[in-house]
Amino acid sequence: MATGGYRSGGSTTTDFLEEWKAKREKMRAKQNPAGPGSSGGDPAAKSPAGSLTPTAVAGTSELNHGPAGAAAPAAPAPGALNCAHGSSTLPRAAPGSRRAEDECPSAAAASGAPGSRGDEEEPDSAREKGRSSGPSARKGKGQIEKRKLREKRRSTGVVNIPAAECLDEYEDDEAGQKERKREDAITQQNTIQNEAATLPDPGTSYLPQDPSRTVPGRYKSTTSAPEDEISNRYPRTDRSGFSRHNRDANAPASFSSSSTLEKRIEDLEKEVVRERQENLRLVRLMQDKEEMIGKLKEEIDLLNRDLDDMEDENEQLKQENKTLLKVVGQLTR
């Protein structure tokens, strides 16, 4: 073959393959010094330059269909020599071929003759697959999750709450909100009634009333109507969130209303005590007057009897006077 000038593409590919296979065999001999590849020599180096062995064809196919990251083999320079078999061609290999072989050594080793390394990698991969996907792996994953859940519970003391308890919480919130609304309504009603009672008209007389009797009957419809409207207007889920929001928002208002309610209750109790004392005083006056009336009635009865006696005496005296006049008239004759 010519030593310089333009060379055909077939000879260039053949020389590159021969150099690549020689280097591969050398690397395989370094990895497995006792293997059959080191003692058998290089069968591809003995083949003629014009003919391609099956292994060479496989190598070319693997090189052409290699990974995307591997660099394409560069053609040697026109002045490069075109013959050299064996290990002597390794130093003269093109830099492009070295780069390609360095970037994909694993693909070259796997595509060659079936060696001991490929045989060892297959059971290893099978073992790894068996470890990753099997009942033991699922069991280990479940144990890890249980351990994490235990650690969470241990650190915080919080247990997962089922949905039923959440619904119970919402219902409790609704009940508490209804009670607060009812108390607020009763408080407002009591304040209105007490203000109306403490400011009577000057021309009218003051009559004490019991607020416990008058309040429920008068304001029963007003307290029950908003609850019915809320229950009809909002579903259960909306009412739960609405009640919780209102409870958080009306917390200071409820505290102030409770304090005012307590003060109002104390004032009402004092007022009730005063009214009871006044009532007792009036009852005593009425009893005294009734006693006086009874005594006066007895005196009137006595006077009526005396009057009757005096009328009888007067009639008797009139009769006596008539008789005396008759006697005197007879005597004068």
From Swiss-Prot:
Region (Leucine-zipper) residue spans: 293-333
Localization of this protein: Cytoplasm; Nucleus
Database matches in InterPro entries: Par-4
GO process terms (BP): apoptotic signaling pathway; negative regulation of B cell proliferation; negative regulation of epithelial to mesenchymal transition; negative regulation of fibroblast proliferation; negative regulation of gene expression; negative regulation of T cell proliferation; negative regulation of T cell receptor signaling pathway; negative regulation of transcription by RNA polymerase II
Keyword Cell membrane applies: no
Main location (coarse class): cytoplasm
GO MF term list: enzyme binding; leucine zipper domain binding
PTM info: Preferentially phosphorylated at the Thr-156 by PKC in cancer cells.
Keywords: Apoptosis, Coiled coil, Cytoplasm, Nucleus, Phosphoprotein, Transcription, Transcription regulation
Listed Low complexity bias regions: 1-14, 33-51, 66-80, 105-116
Stretches for region Disordered: 1-262
Modified residues (Phosphoserine): S224
Gene Ontology cellular-component terms listed: actin cytoskeleton; chromatin; cytoplasm; cytosol; nucleus; plasma membrane
Composition-biased stretches (Polar residues): 186-196
Residues forming coiled coils: 255-333
Segments carrying motif Nuclear localization signal: 138-154
B30.2/SPRY domain-binding motif, short sequence motif: residues: 62-66
Subunit structure, as described in the record: Homooligomer. Interacts (via the C-terminal region) with WT1. Interacts with THAP1. Interacts with AATF. Interacts with BACE1. Interacts with SPSB1 (via B30.2/SPRY domain); this interaction is direct and occurs in association with the Elongin BC complex. Interacts with SPSB2 (via B30.2/SPRY domain); this interaction occurs in association with the Elongin BC complex. Interacts with SPSB4 (via B30.2/SPRY domain); this interaction occurs in association with the Elongin BC complex. Component of a ternary complex composed of SQSTM1 and PRKCZ. Interacts with actin.
Domains (record comment): The leucine-zipper domain is not essential for apoptosis, but is required for sensitization of cells to exogenous apoptotic insults and for interaction with its partners. The SAC domain is a death-inducing domain selective for apoptosis induction in cancer cells. This domain is essential for nuclear entry, Fas activation, inhibition of NF-kappa-B activity and induction of apoptosis in cancer cells.
Any further remark recorded for this protein: The synapses are crucial cellular sites for the cell death promoting actions of PAWR in motor neurons. Targeted inhibition of PAWR by RNAi is neuroprotective.
Function description: Pro-apoptotic protein capable of selectively inducing apoptosis in cancer cells, sensitizing the cells to diverse apoptotic stimuli and causing regression of tumors in animal models. Induces apoptosis in certain cancer cells by activation of the Fas prodeath pathway and coparallel inhibition of NF-kappa-B transcriptional activity. Inhibits the transcriptional activation and augments the transcriptional repression mediated by WT1. Down-regulates the anti-apoptotic protein BCL2 via its interaction with WT1. Also seems to be a transcriptional repressor by itself.
Protein name: PRKC apoptosis WT1 regulator protein
Species in which this protein is naturally found: Mus musculus (Mouse)
